[in-house]
Amino acid sequence: MSADAYHPPTTSPRLETLDVLSIGMSLDVFRQGQVWKALQEQNAAQAEALHVGSILPMDPKKYPTSADDKDMAYEKRQADALELGLKNFLEKWPIPTVTVVRGWDPSTPNLRFTPEETRESLSVKVNDLRVPAGLHWHRIANLQDGIICNDTPEGVLEALFSLFERNPDLPAVLVYANEGISMAGALSSRDVTLKSLGAVSGPRIPGTLTDAMVALIVGRPERVDWLRQFAPYTKVNENRIDPEFRGWGWRKPPVEFRPTPFIPQPWTERALEQWDALPVLARLHRPVSVPLTHPDTGERLKREALTAQLAAAWKTASAGLRPAPARLFYDGGLNATPLAELTPALGAAQSSLDLLDSRESYDLTQRLGDTGAASPFVGITLATMASYLNGDSSMVMPLRRKDQATLIGISSPTPGKKPVHDPFGVDLLPQTASGDGPPPSADPVAPASRLTTRLPPGEDYALEEFLSSLKPSTDWQDDL
């Protein structure tokens, strides 16, 4: 065996794709594949995309009304998303993590929480969710500058590609996006009342933010091949399901292990078993971003110029997708009409997509409500599900920025071949499961004690006490 086989890669070519290794999503009362299923039921009932409404329940009884119960629902949703996205991932390895929330300006007057409190709270956000998510053996390592506060965070995706290129030893990254009424309240000024956001006691206010949380793991699986050379020499733990490295066995490797920034210890054979069990759900293609403003005046392009720019971007982004995109997930936010600009652009690009067909056209705000800063990642998650299950390709277009459009291709790892198994079921541990019902084939279990958060009136609690302080509750079985 060459000594080179024992060393990590030291350079990286330009990357055009990253593998989607895991996804987890909570969206209002839905979890994981329930969202895609609800969208398909809509399509079957209404073929015309313009006439499709929201999948969110219209019955106010489906939602909690007290402030405590609203906070409880938010806590469950954010923990469920992390559990679904991380539970089958490699344990004991600190996965580099990016946290994405809505825009926040520390210089805003009269903030609800001090900048120091907010920075600290966001920095521990994902790690603190491990316990309520039942992820006791998983490890989180925040990336430097890995807290992203941005209302239109699709730029994170290009940054991920650059990160992998700059760090050839990096095998995977977790992106955790968290949006909702509670997050909006925590990051806002006191001049914005919690009542206006829908965060206090009372029925749900139509048009308020949709709670949307996504855990997305992307990576390059081949980058751990050098660790396979060391694995046979690692000690087998007394608890054989424990993947942690606790030293060498009776034999030492012929080449000294040298830690890297992202691989501080050798991986055991059990760790590699967990890694190799991860499916590749999709290929995430490098985003294509184009300006929608005139280079001289800064004014937004209009009519033919806008159509030509969007058409050129579509051709570039879809060139690497095989087959051509079968559907488009797009989001212009509230009070926007993306179809008016997209339809002529796709026509000019000679795309076969029919954006008036509900099976091919998904306006995220129209169908899911306002998912805010989580929108690009909700689109990627849905595109991953759709393309994996159908063996085809999808396109995601965040369009909330008026000065720029971003196109993100998602393709099946096995084009033209539909899988036998659907991996997007709601498989939550009973002690952390949401009230959506027991996991498939699971025996009914008694309701577990619930954990909730509250913001005492008139008290300036730290952000983590608003979002993460724990209060036992056994008198309300949340249906969310």
Swiss-Prot record:
Region (Disordered): 410-458
Subcellular location(s) per record: Cytoplasm
Highest taxon listed in the record's lineage: Bacteria
Cytoplasm recorded as keyword: yes
InterPro entries assigned: Tla3_C, Tla3_N
GO cellular component, one term: cytoplasm
Record flagged with keyword Repeat: no
GO molecular function annotations of the record: identical protein binding
Pfam families found in the cross-reference section: Tla3_C, Tla3_N
Keywords tagged on the record: Cytoplasm
Major localization class: cytoplasm
Coiled coil ranges: none
Known role: Adapter protein that targets and loads the Tle3 toxin onto the H2 type VI secretion system (H2-T6SS) machinery through an interaction with the TTR domain of VgrG2b. Seems specific for Tle3.
Subunit relationships: Interacts with the Tle3 toxin on one side and with the H2-T6SS component VgrG2b on the other side.
Record's protein name: Type VI lipase adapter protein Tla3
Gene name of this polypeptide: tla3
